[in-house]
């Protein structure tokens, strides 16, 4: 399994997915985590799993459809380029199944690690 991680360590509001990545990797050595730039092309697996900052949520949450981010959303992907690229891949038919593990920008580090870990492998 591969999980893509989006984020920008230079922007505080978008840095948490990158900051927690070493701990998540330690918890799940059998999973391949890859930091990706939303503006680059990526191989799209049958099920694309992404960890990214999501504005407008108070807790770590899983999204299984891009419809939650379209129009005038109640929540929005922090990085518009990620959303635009994902919609493009969906339109091309290359995006079959998606899971976005949304991380609020201001959640506590340890809480984020715990919540994401529980979503990756629920107990």
Locations of the language-model features?
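N-terminal catalytic or cofactor-binding beta/alpha core of small enzyme domains
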Residues: 1-123
């Amino acid at each position: 399994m591969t999980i893509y991680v989006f984020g920008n360590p230079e922007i505080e509001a978008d840095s948490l997915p990158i900051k927690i990545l070493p701990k998540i990797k330690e918890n799940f050595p059998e999973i391949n985590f890859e930091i990706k730039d939303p503006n680059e092309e990526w191989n799209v697996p049958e099920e694309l799993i992404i960890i990214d900052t999501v504005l407008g949520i108070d807790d770590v949450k899983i999204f299984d459809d891009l419809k939650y981010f379209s129009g005038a959303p109640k929540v929005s992907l922090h990085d518009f380029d990620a959303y635009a690229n994902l919609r493009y891949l969906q339109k091309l038919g290359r995006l079959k199944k998606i899971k976005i593990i949304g991380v609020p920008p201001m959640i506590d580090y340890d809480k984020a690690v715990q919540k994401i870990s529980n979503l990756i492998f629920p107990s």
